[in-house]
Amino acid sequence: MKLSTLLVAFVLLVITVILSTPSTNAKALAESNALAVAVSEAEPWLGALFSFIRFIAPYVIRAVRVLIQVVSKVVKPAKVAMKYAKKIATNVAKDVAKDMATDIAIDTITGGDE
């Protein structure tokens, strides 16, 4: 998996965790609600966006966790399979090259295919 993909997944995970963490500090909660009200009065669609993000954040966290679990289960066997496929392809290529070199050497010594 690419580092950039992991970085994007990590950033999304951090954002969703921050947005979904309930505030235990009453002052922070009041400021958050005041900000949401002020933003929703200034730009109604932005307030709706904040509400939607707060609503969907737990589901996004759950989906990211499941995605990470699935990817980790799929990537490991795929890496092992690619490693063995590469090894098999290398061995086959070596065998073919060896056979061709032997045939060329025999043809050279005997004077060709006769």
UniProtKB/Swiss-Prot annotation:
Function: May have antimicrobial properties, like most ant linear peptides.
Subcellular location: Secreted
Family that this chain belongs to: Belongs to the formicidae venom precursor-01 superfamily.
Signal sequence coordinates: 1-20
Keywords assigned: Antimicrobial, Secreted, Signal
Cystine connections: none
Protein name: U-myrmeciitoxin(01)-Mg8a
Keyword Mitochondrion: no
GO cellular component: extracellular region
Tissue expression pattern: Expressed by the venom gland.
Propeptide residues per the UniProt entry: 21-44
